[in-house]
């Protein structure tokens, strides 16, 4: 697979980056990397995979953004993302929503770098696609430069892009 052009990427946002917005953005630019809304790995595991993961190939290049904290479920979701034709798999570590945090995914995982590393390692082992993260630079009391530096280095060791 050729390297994705990341000059411009449209950040994924719940209730915004749906298939209609991606179609519209693709009309404006053929090259920008688009993202799905965050899809929770548990929903993929238990739900209608086709309904959750299918997209129009005219949207490409498009990254599948996942949320979750189970290495096994995230690995399986990454595998399915490749099967459905996505160009990249992205783990959401940036969503600050209270509902998302209550379910132990999104930005709150910044407090658990070893769990995140386990999740990323499993995802990377299940796909040949690039695996990336969307993150914040801090979270609550984990907001010092040293925390960010250590967090990024732990993730980097997994091979995440």
Question: Where are the regions that the model predicts?
Answer:
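Extreme N-terminal starter segment of soluble prokaryotic enzymes
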Residues: 1-8
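A cross-family glycoside hydrolase active-site/sugar-binding cleft signature
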Residues: 11-13, 37, 65-67, 92-94, ...
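Gly/Ser/Thr-rich beta-alpha loop segments that engage phosphate groups in nucleotides
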Residues: 13, 70, 96, 108, ...
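Glycine-rich, positively charged N-terminal anion/phosphate-binding segment
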Residues: 13-87
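Alpha/beta enzyme core
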Residues: 23, 27-29, 75-89, 93-105, ...
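Short, hinge-like loop/turn segments at secondary-structure boundaries
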Residues: 51-55, 107-109, 149-151
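Core AdoMet radical
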Residues: 67, 105-110
């Amino acid at each position: 697979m050729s390297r994705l052009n990341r000059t411009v990427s449209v950040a994924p946002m719940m209730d915004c980056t749906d298939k209609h917005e991606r179609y519209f953005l693709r009309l404006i630019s053929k090259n920008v990397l688009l993202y799905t809304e965050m899809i929770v790995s548990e929903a993929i595991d238990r739900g209608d995979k086709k309904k959750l993961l299918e997209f129009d190939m005219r949207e490409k290049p498009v990254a599948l953004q996942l949320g979750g904290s189970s290495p096994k479920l995230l690995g399986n979701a990454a595998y399915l993302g490749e099967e459905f034709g996505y160009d990249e798999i992205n783990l959401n570590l940036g969503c600050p929503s209270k509902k998302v945090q209550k379910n132990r995914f999104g930005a709150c995982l910044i407090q658990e770098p070893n769990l995140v590393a386990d999740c990323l390692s499993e995802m990377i082992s299940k796909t040949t696609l690039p695996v990336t993260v969307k993150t914040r630079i801090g979270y609550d009391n984990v907001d010092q430069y040293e925390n960010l530096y250590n967090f990024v280095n732990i993730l980097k060791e997994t091979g995440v892009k």
